[in-house]
C-alpha cells in the first residue's frame, strides 16, 4: 500500500473481528497508530483507483533506465517495476554508496539502515521525471567507477 501509492512511511490497515477482541486490541500500545492526517491521506489515496495504473508505466520506464545505467559495478535488486523504490548495491563492499551518490546530489537511504545490508547498498525512490537525468548521470558515474 504505502509504496504503491507513493506514501512510503504511512502504514494503514484494518481488522475485522468481534467486539470482544476489539476491547483487548484497544488496550495494546501500537507503534503504528495512525494520526487523523494519516487516515485522511490513506483514504484519499484509496479513493483514487486510477493512480497506480496511471503512473505504473512511468515507474516501469524509469526503473528500466536505471537498470541500464548501472554499469559493471552496480546491481539493482529485482522488485516489481511498478513500485517507485529500488535497492542498489555496489560490488565494492568498502564503498559507501550513499556518500558517493550524495556527491552527485542524489538523496538515498544507506543500506546500513536495513539489516543485513551494508554501506555498499542504498534504497532510493524513483524521482520525478524532470530529475531522472541527474539520477541516471550519478548512477552511471558510480557504476563505472572502480
Listing of model-derived features with the role each one plays in the protein:
Residues 25, 97-100, 135-138:
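Hydrophobic side chains in well-ordered alpha-helices
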Residues 107:
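Residue-level detector of anion-binding/catalytic polar loops
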Residues 58, 69, 100, 138-141:
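Alpha-helical scaffold elements within enzyme catalytic domains, especially in hydrolases
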Residues 2, 112-115:
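Short, acidic/turn-prone active-site loops that include or flank metal/cofactor-
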Residues 60, 73-104, 122, 126-128:
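Conserved PLP-binding catalytic core of the aspartate aminotransferase-like
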Residues 78-80, 114-117:
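A short beta-turn/loop motif at secondary-structure boundaries
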Residues 103-104, 115-146:
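PLP-dependent enzyme catalytic core of the Aspartate aminotransferase-like
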Amino acid at each position: 500500500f504505502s509504496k504503491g501509492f507513493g506514501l512510503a512511511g504511512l502504514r494503514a490497515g484494518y481488522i475485522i473481528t468481534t467486539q470482544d477482541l476489539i476491547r483487548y486490541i484497544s488496550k495494546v500500545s501500537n507503534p503504528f497508530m495512525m494520526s487523523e492526517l494519516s487516515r485522511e491521506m490513506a483514504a484519499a489515496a484509496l479513493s483514487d483507483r486510477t493512480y497506480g495504473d496511471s503512473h505504473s508505466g512511468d515507474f516501469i520506464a524509469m526503473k528500466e533506465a536505471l537498470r541500464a545505467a548501472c554499469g559493471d559495478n552496480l546491481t539493482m535488486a529485482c522488485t516489481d517495476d511498478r513500485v517507485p523504490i529500488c535497492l542498489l548495491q555496489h560490488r565494492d563492499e568498502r564503498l559507501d554508496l550513499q556518500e558517493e551518490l550524495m556527491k552527485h546530489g542524489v538523496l538515498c537511504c544507506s543500506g546500513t539502515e536495513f539489516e543485513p545490508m551494508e554501506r555498499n547498498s542504498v534504497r532510493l525512490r524513483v524521482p520525478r521525471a524532470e530529475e531522472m537525468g541527474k539520477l541516471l548521470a550519478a548512477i552511471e558515474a558510480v557504476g563505472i567507477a572502480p
